[in-house]
Amino acid sequence: MGSDTKTAEAFANSWNNLPEGSVYTKDQFEDWFAPLTRKDIEGKSVLELGCGNGSLMVHMVIWKPEYLEGVDLGDSVVTAEINLAGRENVQVTKGDLVEFTSPEPFDIVYCIGVLHHLQSPEKGFESVIRNTKAGGNFHCWVYAREGNAVIRYIVDPVRKVASVLPWWMTKYFFATPLVVPFYLYAKLMKLLPKIALFKKLPLYEYALWIAEREFAFFRHVAFDQLVTPQTAYIPKATIEQWLTSRKEIDQKTTYIIMRNGNSWKFGGKIATS
């Protein structure tokens, strides 16, 4: 079994044990996609690579794409189909996003929170580019190497043990107790005044962002981080290399945006000639 297949199966255990619907709020969805907005999506063909249980697609349909397709290697596609039941012009496809090649490229291709879990994140990015039509937009989000020292040195070693255990053990005996201190830390950061001293604390911006959510979401995020067999923390320099080394990309349109102090949003357009 390939490592990406193991990862897909691990995440299916995560996604398939959530309540029906999207685990994300409207504000979280819009934050992940900025600088893209509804006007960029409306009436366009849109592809999500690594759709999980369809949590992002549930929000994406509200932006009224002409056609929306999600691809995922795991059995979470079953839950995605349930969450998207009754929506018109929506399709969920079970397949390897790295190998996926659409007969017709899409106007918009996005990959949120998936590339960093692949055996080869760069090959995943190549699929994003390959499936975007000339003049179309691509948009990705990945964990950053920058700003994640606490995660890399404390959480990631735990992941190497937890990821080989049964999902329920990882969720309830690892993710739950591990996330309690960070839950309290994030809620405290939200209450404290926004002064320069506190802004130097670990994961400060991320703590303020996630503090808007309930404990169950904290645990979902922790479980996601612990259940996967592999996680890469990608430096900005690597993303710059991905973007600048591909002649298909219109270099005048590219962007790399730090999100919450510990992740990167990046994207651009495919050149028309």
Please give the residue ranges for each predicted region.
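Short conserved AdoMet
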Residues: 85, 119, 133
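Substrate-binding/catalytic lobe of Class I Rossmann-like enzymes that use SAM or dcSAM, i.e.
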Residues: 165-244, 248
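A short SAM/SAH-binding and catalytic strip from SAM-dependent methyltransferases
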Residues: 108-119
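Conserved N-terminal segment of class I S-adenosyl-L-methionine
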Residues: 1-47, 51-104, 108, 232, ...
